[in-house]
């Protein structure tokens, strides 16, 4: 009862074909593949961006403290 048999999967597949039609399912899968490819390309673009260059010059700030307490 807990697992689905082959007949259950065939019925689900038949219902999906009736709802979406024969041409719509490959189109949906193509859109999913394009989305995944675009996501991977975006992730690779982020990794190729060089980190900002760090400044090698140091700064010294001089300040005299107020001695009136």
Curated annotation (Swiss-Prot):
Q: Which UniProt keywords apply?
A: Cell inner membrane, Cell membrane, Membrane, Protein transport, Translocation, Transmembrane, Transmembrane helix, Transport
Q: Which GO terms describe its cellular component?
A: TAT protein transport complex
Give GO terms for biological process.
Answer: protein transport by the Tat complex
Q: Which InterPro entries match?
A: TatA/B/E, TatA/E
Give a yes or no for keyword Cell membrane in this entry.
Answer: yes
Sequence intervals crossing the membrane: 1-21
Record membrane topology: Single-pass membrane protein
Any GO MF annotation of the entry: protein transmembrane transporter activity
Report biased composition (Basic and acidic residues) as residue ranges.
60-69
Q: Which parts of this chain are annotated as the region Disordered? A: 41-69
Entry's localization field: Cell inner membrane
Job of this protein: Part of the twin-arginine translocation (Tat) system that transports large folded proteins containing a characteristic twin-arginine motif in their signal peptide across membranes. TatA could form the protein-conducting channel of the Tat system.
Q: Which family does it belong to?
A: Belongs to the TatA/E family.
For this protein, the record's HAMAP family field holds: TatA_E (MF_00236)
Subunit note: The Tat system comprises two distinct complexes: a TatABC complex, containing multiple copies of TatA, TatB and TatC subunits, and a separate TatA complex, containing only TatA subunits. Substrates initially bind to the TatABC complex, which probably triggers association of the separate TatA complex to form the active translocon.
Protein name according to UniProt: Sec-independent protein translocase protein TatA
According to its UniProt entry, this protein's organism is Rhizobium rhizogenes (strain K84 / ATCC BAA-868)
């Amino acid at each position: 009862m807990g697992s689905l048999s082959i007949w259950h999967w065939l019925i689900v597949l038949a219902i999906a074909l009736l709802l979406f039609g024969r041409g719509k399912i490959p189109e949906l899968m193509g859109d999913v593949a394009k989305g995944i490819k675009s996501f991977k390309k975006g992730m690779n673009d982020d990794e190729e961006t060089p980190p900002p260059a760090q400044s090698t010059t140091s700064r010294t700030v001089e300040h005299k403290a107020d001695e009136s307490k």
